[in-house]
């Protein structure tokens, strides 16, 4: 890749502007207008391409010769897609539990794939080791200012689509990159008064644990089926975010997240992974209504935006297996 074409690739964002549509079904459940930000239609399958694409483009401008990314799947696919666009070799380090379909997708993007450890944190150690090689750059799935800067583009799109600020933004938290990006975006567009409902599953609730403790907390293990939320420790930036905007942290059980995936499939005819189900459970499990009753959210919300963060770690067979495992009716 040479000359003007290379410069164009490095300048144009890799993410696409995604639809923001009101959901009749979820609005009926919530008793208020619910708008869905469909990040699951990103070309890399999730919102991750916003931040990671931006990061990789900046690293390419600085002369990076090889990218390496530890991932539960979604970040790796975003990094592999970005590397392929930039013509840079990439190594993706995944936990051994990663599905074969994700590995196939990564290899299809031309990535070298290494499977290491039980959870993401262990894969991340290997990625950091590889990043010490000359010319190699580690792509954090969530913990870098360029990642947050790229993810902030999502809020700029919300501002362009909505006439007025939403009553709340609902999102899932894993390592905290989406949360940090949304906070950055809200501050940028002057919507810092909009509360954020930050959803996690029990067993991957490192952000909730950190808020309760008032400091970063490392979970002993990731026991949730929502593997894409599986960072034992969130980014330190998330605690700062909770001071800059109103962030309401909520934890749901795996069963609630998986039931939300099934209901969303029935309602919207789209299949997302349990990590995304955690955000959808804010509506389906009545959490928004409870927060209103408790006075933590306004009793008269004009609308709510739920970020459908996407996900590549799911199939119809996996969903059925999860429903059986968790005894979901």
Swiss-Prot record:
Lineage: superkingdom: Eukaryota
pH effects: Optimum pH is 9.0 for serine dehydratase activity and 8.0 for glutamate racemase activity.
Temperature dependence: Optimum temperature is 45 degrees Celsius at pH 8.3 for serine dehydratase and glutamate racemase activities.
N6-(pyridoxal phosphate)lysine modified-residue sites: 48
Gene Ontology terms describing biological process: lipid metabolic process
Co-factor requirement: pyridoxal 5'-phosphate
Regulation: Serine dehydratase activity is inhibited by manganese chloride, ferrous chloride, cobalt chloride, cupric chloride, nickel chloride and zinc chloride. Glutamate racemase activity is inhibited by manganese chloride, ferrous chloride, cupric chloride and zinc chloride.
InterPro entries for this protein: Ser/Thr_Dehydratase (IPR050147), TrpB-like_PALP (IPR001926), TrpB-like_PALP_sf (IPR036052)
Keyword Nucleotide-binding: no
Keywords, in A-Z order: Acetylation, Isomerase, Lipid metabolism, Lyase, Pyridoxal phosphate
Catalysis: reaction(s): L-serine = pyruvate + NH4(+); L-threonine = 2-oxobutanoate + NH4(+); L-glutamate = D-glutamate
Pfam families: PALP (PF00291)
Keyword Acetylation: yes
Parts of the chain that traverse the membrane: none
Record-level Gene Ontology MF annotations: glutamate racemase activity; identical protein binding; L-serine ammonia-lyase activity; pyridoxal phosphate binding; threonine deaminase activity
Record-listed E.C. numbers: 5.1.1.3, 4.3.1.17, 4.3.1.19
Sites of N-acetylmethionine modification: 1
Quaternary structure and interacting proteins, as annotated: Monomer. Homodimer.
Functional summary from the UniProt entry: Catalyzes the pyridoxal-phosphate-dependent dehydrative deamination of L-threonine and L-serine to ammonia and alpha-ketobutyrate and pyruvate, respectively. Also exhibits racemase activity towards L-glutamate and D-glutamate.
Similarity-based family: Belongs to the serine/threonine dehydratase family.
Protein name: Serine dehydratase-like
Organism name: Rattus norvegicus
Gene name of the encoded protein: Sdsl
